[in-house]
Structure formats: structure tokens, C-alpha cells
């Protein structure tokens, strides 16, 4: 049933109908559309459009429809209705007859869909926040179990300074905490109701929109009807949140793909999140992580696409805005799936401590310690930096780590170097000295774990 047929003398071309209809994707808003309709029926009682008995009949029928939708949402797709609003209204009329035709009084699909989408976004943000915190918790637990797993830290994908696997985990906890904060911030701006703004100029009925907003669980009602029906900032914000969050997950995946490789060998992934090759029997491929990394691109694309869709639209509503849903649904579904999968990857990961330790001892990751040692002996840092660079060249020539160079060889580069240099060059000393807040010392890592556990109520 079309909601707009009276103006037209010809039926829509079937090809246009297929092009125009949105039920195939906006059916996901069915529950929100029904909930919004119940609230609207209550508002219509306050302005005398519906009697209390009529409202009761409508609410009962809508609640029955809500249970039917929850039991089998796929039934909606069997309809040829234009959109979810048409489908709900048609089903309501089937249940209560002519009374169902009174429900849309004073309401437009413009404020209706804006409300539906905001309600859906609020619910989805809460799901994302839960999944985000679950992954943070998994990272904290993995960190706690691997505080003594020393490994090389990297810059430019070259070994730089020793860190611990726990410190690496906590780096991603920080990223995810920022993602959590962004979602919570987005939720604040989502929490205003556009219902009652009509097509663009507001409703002609003296409905208390603040009361209506409260019935729907919003903090308040929007302030301008033109903006309310054309606002899709919340879609852009959520897509931006998702794009940033997926960048973090993609980096997480890339790190672990490298750590899991034969070239690094720092971790082994569980069989539960890997697959094999149809040709090469020995292969164990990190498919879960590669898919997380790969799916990042589709989320970035959804954000870019929506920004391009909105950038040239005049006020107020335009049909272009129908394009807001498919990209949003897919992007947030993808982000949610990837958060869950990242937690599953951590659930079975094994850290290979001996291999991590060996790698941390290679690559002259303690060179900065020698420079700091020279500074403590009164050598200016820039000069110390140069001295250590020369010492590294000599160590490479001899095929030895810095700590294996004889004292006489080290003193060729600076006479201030003494026997006390060797304890300074140990991996444990490298870690212990990074004791400022946020550093990799065991004490700081333990404190960071405790802080994260307190924040996450673990």
C-alpha cells in the first residue's frame, strides 16, 4: 500500500518501484517504527485526535505486531510495501481496520524515519560499547598474563627498544578507550527526538514534544523542524567513530599477523581463528585477522560515501537521504563483528616467550641505554648519540651484541665507559629505567593493568 497515491493518475512503473523502494533494508527499523508509533498514538490522545479507547486498541495491535516481528523479522521482506512505515501501517490496518488510518495524523515519514533511525542508532551504540569493553577486558587479561614476556618494540618496522607483550596489549586498550569515549559522546547528540517535526515545518497539532521525547527514551526534543528532518550528523558521527575504530582494529590485526608470521614467530594463533590452504598442507593462515584488516576499507568507504551524499543537499528532506541506511547498517555490523572476532583471537593466543626474548636481544635495542649511560657520565646527548652509533657499527662488524663487546673496544669510542656499563645494557635494565608514567617498566605496566581493571570493573 502506497501512502501517497491520491495525487497520481498513473501507477508507478515497476522498474521505478524497485528502484525507489527501501523495504529490503529499512525493514531493520521495524521495531523502532512500531515503538515510535505507540508513542505517537499517545500524543494524539492529548490533542483529541484519538480517544483513550482508540489509542488502547492501536497500542495493543502494535504490540502484537511487535512480537510478530521479533519472532520472524524476515516475514517483512515477503511484502511489496514501499518501506517499513508503509508495511507497519498496512499491518496495523489489517488488525484494526479503519482506525489504523488515523495513526499517521500530524506525522510525516520525514520525522518518522529520522526518529526510527535515531532509536536504532542508540540501541546499536550500546551494543558497540559492550563489545568494545569486552575487547578491552580481553586485552587487559592478556596483558596481565604476559607481563614478563619481553619483546622488541618497533619503529619503521625495525627493532627499536625492548617492550613487553603486556605493554603492547595496553596500547590497544588506550585506543579502544578513546573509541569508547567517542561513542559515548556521539550518544549524547543522538539523544534528541525529531518526532513531531512533520515534513519540515512542524506539526499542526499542539503536541508536547518534550513529553513525547520522554516516552521514547530521549533526553529532549529537537529545536528546529527544518534541521530535525534533514539532520544526518549522527550518521556521519557514527560512521566516523566506526572508521576510526576499524583503523585501530586493522592495526591490531596487522601487528598480530606479523607477530604470527614465521619471520617473527612471537605468537601462535588458535586453530579456531585460522584456516588452511587447499593446496599447501602445512599452511595455517591468520584469516580472522586478515579479514579484520580487509573489512576496514569498506567502513572507510561508507563514511566517504555518506559525506558525498550529504554535502550538496538543500534543506529540508531529500530522497538522497534514503542512502543513509545501507552504508550505516553495514559499517556498524562490520565494526561489531570485528570487535567480537578480535576478542576471540585473543582468547586462544599463545605468546612464545623465548622467541620474543631472543628477538628483543637482537637488533641493538639497548643502544639508547648506552647513550643515556654516557649522558649520566657528563657527555652531551648529541655527542653520546654519535658515539653509540659508531659503537654499533663496530659491534655489527664483529657480529656481536653491544653487551658482548670487550670494555677495551667500547673505550675506543669514549674513555668514560667503565665496567659499570654492562648491567645497564641488560634487557631488564632497559625496561626498569622506563619508570615514568606510561612507560614500559614492570611497575608502570602493573599499575596500568590495575587502572584498566578498575575502569572496566574487572
UniProtKB/Swiss-Prot annotation:
GO molecular function: argininosuccinate lyase activity
Record bears the keyword Lyase: yes
Enzyme class: lyase
This protein's UniProt keywords: Amino-acid biosynthesis, Arginine biosynthesis, Cytoplasm, Lyase
Subcellular location: Cytoplasm
This protein's pathway: Amino-acid biosynthesis; L-arginine biosynthesis; L-arginine from L-ornithine and carbamoyl phosphate: step 3/3
Domain of life: Bacteria
Catalytic activity: 2-(N(omega)-L-arginino)succinate = fumarate + L-arginine
GO biological process, any: L-arginine biosynthetic process
Pfam annotation, one family: ASL_C2
NCBIfam families: argH, PRK12308.1
Full protein name: Argininosuccinate lyase
Organism, as annotated: Salmonella paratyphi C (strain RKS4594)
Gene: argH
Amino acid at each position: 500500500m502506497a501512502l501517497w497515491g491520491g495525487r497520481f493518475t498513473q501507477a508507478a512503473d515497476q522498474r521505478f518501484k524497485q528502484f525507489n523502494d527501501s523495504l529490503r533494508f529499512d525493514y531493520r527499523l521495524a521495531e523502532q517504527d512500531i515503538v515510535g508509533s505507540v508513542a505517537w498514538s499517545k500524543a494524539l490522545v492529548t490533542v483529541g485526535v484519538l480517544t483513550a479507547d482508540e489509542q488502547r486498541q492501536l497500542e495493543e495491535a502494535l504490540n502484537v505486531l511487535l512480537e510478530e516481528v521479533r519472532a520472524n523479522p524476515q516475514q517483512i521482506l515477503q511484502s511489496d510495501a514501499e518501506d517499513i512505515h508503509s508495511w507497519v501501517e498496512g499491518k496495523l490496518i489489517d488488525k484494526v481496520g479503519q482506525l489504523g488510518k488515523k495513526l499517521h495524523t500530524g506525522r510525516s515519514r520525514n520525522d518518522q524515519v529520522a526518529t526510527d533511525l535515531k532509536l536504532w542508532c542508540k540501541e546499536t551504540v550500546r551494543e558497540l560499547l559492550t563489545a568494545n569493553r569486552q575487547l578491552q577486558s580481553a586485552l587487559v587479561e592478556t596483558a596481565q598474563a604476559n607481563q614478563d614476556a619481553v619483546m622488541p618494540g618497533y619503529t619503521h618496522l625495525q627493532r627499536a627498544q625492548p617492550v613487553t607483550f603486556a605493554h603492547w596489549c595496553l596500547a590497544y586498550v588506550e585506543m579502544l578507550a578513546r573509541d569508547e569515549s567517542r561513542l559515548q559522546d556521539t550518544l549524547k547528540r543522538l539523544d534528541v527526538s525529531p518526532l513531531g517535526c512533520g515534513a519540515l515545518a512542524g506539526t499542526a497539532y499542539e503536541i508536547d514534544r518534550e513529553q513525547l521525547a520522554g516516552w521514547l527514551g530521549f533526553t529532549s526534543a529537537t529545536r528546529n523542524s527544518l534541521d530535525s528532518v534533514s539532520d544526518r550528523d549522527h550518521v556521519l558521527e557514527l560512521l566516523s567513530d566506526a572508521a576510526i575504530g576499524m583503523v585501530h582494529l586493522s592495526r591490531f590485526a596487522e601487528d598480530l599477523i606479523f607477530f604470527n608470521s614465521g619471520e617473527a614467530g612471537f605468537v601462535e594463533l588458535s586453530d579456531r581463528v585460522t584456516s588452511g590452504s587447499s593446496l599447501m598442507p602445512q599452511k595455517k593462515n591468520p584469516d580472522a585477522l586478515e579479514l579484520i584488516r580487509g573489512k576496514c576499507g569498506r567502513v572507510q568507504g561508507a563514511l566517504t560515501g555518506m559525506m558525498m551524499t550529504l554535502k550538496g543537499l538543500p534543506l529540508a528532506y531529500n530522497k538522497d537521504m534514503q542512502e543513509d541506511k545501507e552504508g550505516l547498517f553495514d559499517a556498524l555490523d562490520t565494526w561489531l563483528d570485528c570487535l567480537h572476532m578480535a576478542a576471540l583471537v585473543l582468547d586462544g593466543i599463545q605468546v612464545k616467550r623465548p622467541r620474543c626474548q631472543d628477538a628483543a636481544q637482537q637488533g641493538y635495542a639497548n643502544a639508547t641505554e648506552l647513550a643515556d649511560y654516557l649522558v649520566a657520565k657528563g657527555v652531551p646527548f648529541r655527542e653520546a648519540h654519535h658515539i653509540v652509533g659508531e659503537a654499533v657499527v663496530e659491534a655489527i662488524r664483529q657480529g656481536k651484541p653491544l653487551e658482548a663487546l670487550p670494555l677495551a673496544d667500547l673505550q675506543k669510542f669514549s674513555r668514560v665507559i667503565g665496567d659499570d656499563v654492562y648491567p645497564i645494557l641488560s634487557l631488564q635494565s632497559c625496561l626498569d629505567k622506563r619508570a615514568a608514567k606510561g612507560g614500559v617498566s614492570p611497575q608502570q605496566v602493573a599499575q596500568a593493568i590495575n587502572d584498566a581493571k578498575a575502569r572496566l570493573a574487572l
